[in-house]
Amino acid sequence: MCDQVRLTYKDLNIREKRIAYPLGKTAEGFQEISWENAFSAIQEKILELQPTSNEVIGLVDTHASNEELYLFKKLLKKGFDSDQLFFPDLEWEQPVSDFFINSLITSDKSPNRAGARMLRLKGAKSSEEVISKIPTGTKVLMVFGKPFEDENLLSQAGNIPLVINIAAWQSGWSETADVTLPGRLHSEKDATYTN
């Protein structure tokens, strides 16, 4: 097991930034709300907005499992007839080395980029590329994890009428979202990853 993974167990116990309950944006800021209130708020807003397939965008983090990526893709397709689901597909390198173990180490530290590619999600190289693909008039943005966490993208997302974030940790996305639903850490899942 690599040092980066082996030594992150301490992060699993940090409770201050953990999202444990659904959060809803109110005039006073974010408040804990019940699951029922979270789902009702999302449903009411979607019924009010009546988004078309081109007005719904999804962003996923490649720390999500294959099962989560598949279900998120299915939600967008079956629920909104949208195939606008993007993941960070950044450039990475694999060093050439005479020492075998070094040839196994790449600059790609994402655990499931290959899984996202195999599920035929749309890769984006940068947040600027994502910004260019979000059309004017987008009504719903669904974000799984914290992909493309960039000030310009977060600022543009603030203009979208409904932003939903599913994440285990607080981030710029949870602060931008109208509703944030708690996600799970890798240690809390029985899931698969394709690296």
Give each language-model segment a name.
Residues 1-189, 194:
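Catalytic alpha/large subunits of respiratory electron-transfer oxidoreductases
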